[in-house]
Each structure stands twice: as C-alpha cells, then as structure tokens.
Amino acid sequence: MLEAVSAVMSLGGMALFAGLGLGYAAKKFHVEADPVVEKLEALLPATNCGMCGHPGCGPYAQAITEGEAINLCTPGGKAVMESIAAMLGVSPAAMDDEGPKVAYIDEEACIGCTACIKVCPVDAIVGANKQSHTVIVAECTSCQLCLEPCPTDCITMQPVPENIYDWTWDKPAGPNSKALH
C-alpha cells in the first residue's frame, strides 16, 4: 500500500512540476498576435483551400495587412470581400469571378472512389465507397479542392441558381447619396 501511495505522489509531483514548467514557458515565450489579422481570419471562410495563392486563411489574412488584394478569396466571394473592405475602411474591389458556384457531380460518371470526400474541407460531399456521390449545395464553399483528385473528371463547378429565397431588394440611396443630389 505504501508503494502505491509513494508512486502516486511521485507521479503527481512530476505532473505538477511539468505543468508549472509549461505554464512558465507559455508566459515567457508568448507571442502577441496582430488583432487585425485575427479579425480578418475570423471573416474568412476557414476552408484553407489555397485558391487565393496562400497556404491557408491565416497567411492570407496576414498578407492582406501587408497590402495583398482583398478580392482573392473565391469561397468567401463578394460578401467576405465587402466585409474585409468595411473592416479595413477601404473601397470594395471587383471580384474577378462570375458569381458564386458550387460543385456538381455527374452521378452517372461517378465511380464512388471517395477521393472528393476525403479532400472536401467542409464535408459538403456525401456518398459511400463504390456508390455515386452528391454535393450538399448549402455546404459547398466553392473551394474547388474536389476537382483535381477526381479520376473520372465528373465534378464541375456550376453557378448557384438564384431562387426566391436568395433574392433581396437593392439598398435604397441614403440622404447623403450622390444619386439624390
């Protein structure tokens, strides 16, 4: 019994010592993050797809603070770009795409290899091995990571069809608008 108590006490002491060491190291080597970069990263879709030319959303947020264009996030689209512009106090830039798109799988050509399912960062593709797959349109972020691994090229990017639920009124001109003067 005494051996068990001494073993527990020694392990507890080592754990306490390691915890104190880690706590000290966390305080000693703490690096202050740029709050603007953190806010930008929160606005980005976090798919880390690399379509902007950076290895993920964090490096792209850092690049924006260093002067990179704010309109390179294809999955985020116009809404994310406008949010970034509003946060930084700059004018929105034109998006160089034709609008939002989602992946479409030709289910007759799909062989059910699951390669697309494995690379989708948001789990927007459903299906089983050796069964045809389909895309959950509401979840697809248009990152296009599913296109390359598909051995049958049965995945294409299709424009998001407009419907009555997505339609919105144009914002009216405000009292300070040049359109009224």
Swiss-Prot record:
Binds 3 [4Fe-4S] clusters. Signal peptide: none annotated. One of its GO terms (cellular component) is plasma membrane. Residues 32-90 form the 4Fe-4S domain. [4Fe-4S] cluster 3 binds at residues 120, 140, 143, 146. Pfam families: Fer4_21, FeS. One of its GO terms (biological process) is electron transport chain. [4Fe-4S] cluster 2 binds at residues 110, 113, 116, 150. It is found in: Cell inner membrane. [4Fe-4S] cluster 1 binds at residues 49, 52, 57, 73. Its cofactor is [4Fe-4S] cluster. Its main location: membrane. Its EC number is 7.-.-.-. Residues 101-130, 131-160 form the 4Fe-4S ferredoxin-type domain. Residues 1-26 are annotated as: Hydrophobic. PROSITE patterns: 4FE4S, 4FE4S_FER_1, 4FE4S_FER_2. PANTHER family: ION-TRANSLOCATING OXIDOREDUCTASE COMPLEX SUBUNIT B (PTHR42859:SF3), OXIDOREDUCTASE (PTHR42859). Part of a membrane-bound complex that couples electron transfer with translocation of ions across the membrane. The complex is composed of six subunits: RnfA, RnfB, RnfC, RnfD, RnfE and RnfG. This is Ion-translocating oxidoreductase complex subunit B. It comes from Magnetococcus marinus (strain ATCC BAA-1437 / JCM 17883 / MC-1). The lineage of its organism: Bacteria, Pseudomonadati, Pseudomonadota, Alphaproteobacteria, Magnetococcales. The gene is rnfB.
